[in-house]
Design a protein with these regions (language model features):
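Polysaccharide-binding and catalytic clefts of secreted carbohydrate-active enzymes
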Residues: 31, 120-365, 370, 516
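Active-site beta-loop-alpha junctions enriched in small/polar residues
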Residues: 8-14, 45-47, 94-98, 225-227, ...
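Hydrophobic faces of well-ordered beta-strands that scaffold small-molecule active sites
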Residues: 3-9, 40-42, 89-91, 220-222, ...
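Active-site mouth loops of central-metabolism enzymes
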Residues: 5-24, 189-204, 392-401
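Catalytic domains of carbohydrate-active enzymes, especially glycoside hydrolases
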Residues: 23-53, 77, 215-219, 408-415, ...
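Aromatic- and glycine-enriched glycan-recognition loops and surfaces
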Residues: 14-33, 57-86, 199-206, 306-313, ...
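Aromatic-lined carbohydrate-binding/catalytic grooves of carbohydrate-active enzymes
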Residues: 29-76, 97-116, 227-242, 296, ...
């Protein structure tokens, strides 16, 4: 079992300062061991977004004796110490970050007196991408020529001296685009967004990768893999490379809008400026107004289409360079965020599925079932995106109450998903602090999971499958979900149905269907019922496959926006509970008594099953999850025995009478092993 850690190690009661994570200590490595962790996310080697020289120091600098006394390590040493203990540390590429920080220097600029956090001493200046690329402080940092002896050139063959200017994305009006969500409130520093379509920036990333691999990084993680979409949502990017590539995109994807355009010389910036558009129009909060701008939907699609080539460029260099230098291929991951549809093209290039779960709530088993399908059979782990419920968990921990945290960590495992342990997890600078686990509770939970790992097979038993049509989801994201990325990405019928079925304690699986993961007869054969929520973009071959499966006795139920080719399968409902009741007619392998605040999943295990039961009965006053006195289940088979495993440890009991299972005194998390 992967036990990921959201391992940014930001300091408590301080802001989260990207892009360079704090220096690690040996005790922090031991903490990972104590919690049975084995995969560190966002853990080291992130500072190339300040400058390549800064990254080199982060990897290789000598540690002063005073810090050695407390076990401090440079990042190369940190990676090695993790490796000795079977722990995989990931280096991180920030694709949406170019930083400039205030600094203070001695008068002759031979000594750095302060950086980011100023002291009011010495001579003021800046350290960042501009200064390090132009050798502004040669007495402090090595020359940029050490890393790029021949310099860098843009796509026209012209030398790029100022990397900040040469890399940054620009708006319609020629302004820089800022990655403002990373900047600390009230701080005088700046985070610019680069353009991933610039060949010169990709060359810089390749050198960054080489330093990471030379430092021993076994995994290179791409954060902000979709920086081009982020730029498009901020009024860009209109650099010369994007304008060239957009012309080629329109040639390959013509439409009625392009019929009268000379695509050999078309300049989208000049086209919009001539029509009177400005940055204000391209960043209008009303998404419908934005999408009504001529060719803007195509421009957004172009930027999304450019994401995959950028990831391929990184992935190929990571694997080729690491194989050459170490004899082994380093792994590649990307922050696939909320399992958004536009991440589909990148999934296949990732060795592990890593992301950032948004909109964390007390209960979200519906999402986790979808997330398991998004994993596509690969292993992975998601960090938490900070929000109100995360802050509530932190308040509970501060008060010595850990039930909400335990539920937060265990609930996804019931459904084949994985949330990383927050170890100095970032809070998006919503408050001046970072997220750490309750240490003793986490150590006990890690030991319990290791002992009971065989009960988490992630092979789920169900008669019903909910089909996730990635093509339809992508269409919804582009037309109504671009400003709902942290919620339902414009696909509420699918996500609402999944949660409704979980609330009704109905077992089901999600069938993730996409160009890279097509629907097959073998996938359909495992089920008696297929539900199609807003699935209107399946290719004809897959519709025919559904019809053939239906003729053999399968039940197809379409809801939401229904494909005209499947109109006869539509079921109209006024509310999700009505739909859930209709779907329950096919029966279930496990029929649960109506018990408030109970979730379940059924893992196939050898010749038996493991029934996972999740208790959501959080008392809002005491912040304690109250015991469920009794729950009864009618099983579709007659087990010979039932063994109970609970966390936290409790007096939970189970008994069998034929095919009826009764469980008493359910703790937060209970697994009933049915043999």
């Amino acid at each position: 079992m992967i036990r990921g850690l959201h391992y940014m190690c930001w300091y408590r009661q301080d802001w989260n300062y990207h892009p360079s994570m704090p220096m690690k200590r040996l005790q922090q490595v031991q903490d990972i061991v104590n919690m049975n962790g084995n995969l560190l996310l966002w853990s080291c080697l992130g500072s190339a977004a300040i400058g390549i020289q800064y990254l080199d120091k982060e990897a290789n600098e000598a540690i002063p004796p005073r810090l050695r006394f407390y076990g401090y390590l440079n990042d190369k040493e940190f990676i090695a110490e993790c490796g000795k203990r079977g722990i995989t540390a990931s280096a991180v590429i920030w694709k949406a970050q170019l930083w400039e920080f205030p600094a203070e220097f001695s008068e002759d600029e031979s000594e750095l007196l302060a950086l980011n956090k100023l002291r009011g001493v010495g001579k003021k200046g800046w350290i960042g991408m501009r200064e390090l690329s132009t050798d502004r402080y040669p007495k402090i940092f090595p020359s940029i020529k050490t890393f790029f002896p021949k310099g860098l050139k843009d796509s026209d063959g012209k030398p790029v001296k100022d990397f900040l200017k040469g890399f940054m994305a620009v708006t319609l009006d020629g302004n820089p685009i800022f990655s403002r969500w990373l900047m600390v409130p009230g701080h005088d520093h700046y985070c610019y967004s680069p353009c991933g379509n610039k060949p010169v920036f990709r060359e810089y990333l390749r050198k960054e990768i080489e330093i990471m691999i030379d430092a021993g990084a076994p995994v290179v993680h791409i954060d902000e893999f979709d920086a081009q979409l982020l730029a498009a949502m901020s009024g860009g990017c209109f650099c010369k490379d994007c304008l060239k590539l957009f012309r080629e995109y329109l040639k390959k994807n013509p439409s009625a809008e392009t019929d009268d355009l000379d695509l050999d010389r078309f300049d989208y910036r000049a086209f919009l400026k001539k029509k009177g558009y400005t940055d204000k129009d391209l960043t209008d909060p009303d998404m419908d107004k934005r999408l009504a701008i001529p060719l803007l939907p195509a421009f957004i699609r172009f930027h999304i289409a450019s994401i995959e080539p950028g990831v391929i460029d990184i992935a190929e260099h990571v694997r080729a360079y690491s194989l050459k230098k170490t004899g082994k291929r380093a792994k590649v991951t990307a922050n696939l965020y909320h399992c958004d549809p536009h991440g589909e093209a990148v999934r296949k290039h990732c060795d592990l599925i890593i992301g950032e779960k948004a909109d964390i709530k007390l209960r979200q088993d519906g999402y986790y079932r979808f997330g398991h399908a998004f994993f596509g059979g690969k292993e992975g782990s998601f960090i938490e995106d900070p929000g109100p419920y995360i802050h509530e968990i932190m308040r509970d921990i501060d008060a010595g109450k850990n039930d909400s945290y335990i539920l937060f960590m265990l609930e996804p495992l019931a459904h084949g998903f994985n949330i990383a342990i927050p170890y100095g997890g970032w809070l998006q600078n919503q408050r001046q602090d970072s997220f750490y686990p309750p240490a003793e509770a986490e150590r006990r939970m890690g030991a319990w999971l290791k002992e009971h790992e065989s009960l988490f097979t992630n092979r789920f038993a169900a008669k019903t499958a909910v089909l996730y049509d990635q093509r339809s989801a992508m269409d919804c994201e582009l037309t109504k979900g671009l400003n709902r990325r942290h919620l339902d990405v414009g696909f509420p019928v699918f996500h609402g149905l999944c949660q409704s079925l979980c609330d009704a304690r109905m077992l089901y699986n999600v069938l993730y269907v996409s160009p890279d993961e097509p629907l097959t007869a073998k996938r359909l054969a495992a089920y008696k019922q297929i539900v199609l929520p807003d699935a209107y973009s399946l290719p004809e071959s897959e519709v025919r496959m559904l019809r053939a499966w239906q003729k053999k006795g399968g039940r197809v139920v379409s809801v939401g926006k229904v494909d005209p080719r499947l109109a006869d399968t539509e079921f109209r409902h006024r509310a999700f509970p009505e739909l859930s009741a209709h779907l329950a007619q096919v029966g279930s392998i496990v029929a649960a008594q109506d018990v408030e605040g109970l979730g379940l999943s059924l893992h196939k295990r050898g010749r038996g099953y493991a029934l996972h039961l999740v208790n959501y009965r959080m008392n809002s006053g005491t912040r304690v999850i109250e015991t469920i006195p009794r729950a009864e289940f009618t099983l579709g088979w007659k087990p010979k025995k039932a063994a109970v495993h609970s966390f936290p440890a409790s007096d939970t009991k189970a008994r069998l009478e034929g095919n009826v299972l009764t469980v008493e005194n359910l703790s937060i998390y209970t697994v009933v092993e049915l043999g």
